[in-house]
Amino acid sequence: MKAVLPDSKIPKRWYNILPDLPEPLAPPLDPETDEPIEPEKLLRIFAEELVKQEMSTERYIEIPKKVRELYAKIGRPTPLFRATNLEKALGTPARIYFKYEGATVTGSHKINTALAQAYYAKEQGIERLVTETGAGQWGTALSLAGALLGLKIRVYMARASYQQKPYRKTIMRLYGAEIYPSPSDRTEIGRKFLSEDPNHPGGLGIAISEAIEDVLKDEKARYALGSVLNHVLMHQTVIGLEAQEQMKEFEEPDVIIGCVGGGSNFAGLAYPFVRDVLSGKADYEFIAVEPKAAPSMTRGVYKYDFGDSGGYTPKMKMHTLGHTYYVPPIHAGGLRYHGLAPTLSILINHGIVKPVAYHQTEVFQAAELFAKTEGIIPAPESAHAIKGVIDRALKAKEEGREEVILFNLSGHGLLDLKGYEDYLDGKLEDYEPDYFPALG
């Protein structure tokens, strides 16, 4: 069972949650003064239109015609499936649906914001975009966006994933991007971390620092971010807006589930539904799933912190483990982040979104069952959502009640097979750190 929309149903507007949040978003702070940052300082890092979108209180932002055309080219609208075989395997009365972002040409949701960010950069006359990537999904997406729109792309990839997922590098290079392991010897902050540990596995926080340092050396370059900030999450709402249309062919969901690193794929599916809860039109539940190795939602502190490891970004008020936190080298590279989207942090604080955390071994067990029943090998990041779905479906079975579960399968795992090999060979290591810098 699946629902497929025609190209004409690609959303014409992104949904901006800012005007609907239960409390105002705390302003980002200038790291030099600890005062709210002036937008002019952000313009040296980000494309101008993205800074405007970040600050906008308009509920809807029109999607440019060119971006909608590119969305159609890369596989939007993506299909929505019912996981009937998984339901049978679990023996649950719950009905499970998933939005499959792995159907895009780059294999994940990341292309939704990559195309938007590249479009606005090109319109401004920017020549080069620089970014970070964890597992490589975001770097791959921005590399293709650059190729389609005529921009040079440079990617700093967390070293652990650079080594674990070699074919991501090949794809990025094929799309024309430069790619470097992070920490690298190309930046001052990279050299600092390498001097402390020549085999440092890196992480999203360090890669962000390197990308920003790189950008500040070139007037024609700007930084592109794969998650966390509001404009990134807003671009992803095409997922949830499509899913709302597709679920009309089936039934209303009771609970919506997604994995979380910075928060963009979760927000992409959930925020259009959150809007209906905040306006009193619906009563959905929302579950956000993270790794126990990077538990910003379940064990972090809500405070101002840097978005990167080097302290180059503005300070944001968010759930954080501390920007100097060493994130263990789990295979879900896209979830190896110390912080969290500020908008999602607020929703968690108000009890609208409920977080849970799992070890990577149990996550891969869930992924194996999903692969055997539904045929799709999920990305390790997306497999966290699947683990959450399975637990929720088994709870419905235990309580003898029907329930409709909708989750975001944010990407496929066909280039993450080293993690699956380690799992099948019994080599996976579970991490549950007991020290986080933000907690002191």
Swiss-Prot record:
Its cofactor is pyridoxal 5'-phosphate. It is an enzyme of class 4 (lyase). This is Tryptophan synthase beta chain. It comes from Thermococcus gammatolerans (strain DSM 15229 / JCM 11827 / EJ3). HAMAP family: Trp_synth_beta. The modification N6-(pyridoxal phosphate)lysine is found at residue 110. Pathway: Amino-acid biosynthesis; L-tryptophan biosynthesis; L-tryptophan from chorismate: step 5/5. InterPro entries: Trp_synth_b-like, Trp_synth_b_CS, Trp_synth_beta, Trp_synth_beta/beta-like, TrpB-like_PALP, TrpB-like_PALP_sf. Belongs to the TrpB family. The keyword Lyase applies. GO terms for molecular function: L-serine hydro-lyase (adding indole, L-tryptophan-forming) activity; pyridoxal phosphate binding; tryptophan synthase activity. The gene is trpB. The beta subunit is responsible for the synthesis of L-tryptophan from indole and L-serine. It catalyses: (1S,2R)-1-C-(indol-3-yl)glycerol 3-phosphate + L-serine = D-glyceraldehyde 3-phosphate + L-tryptophan + H2O.
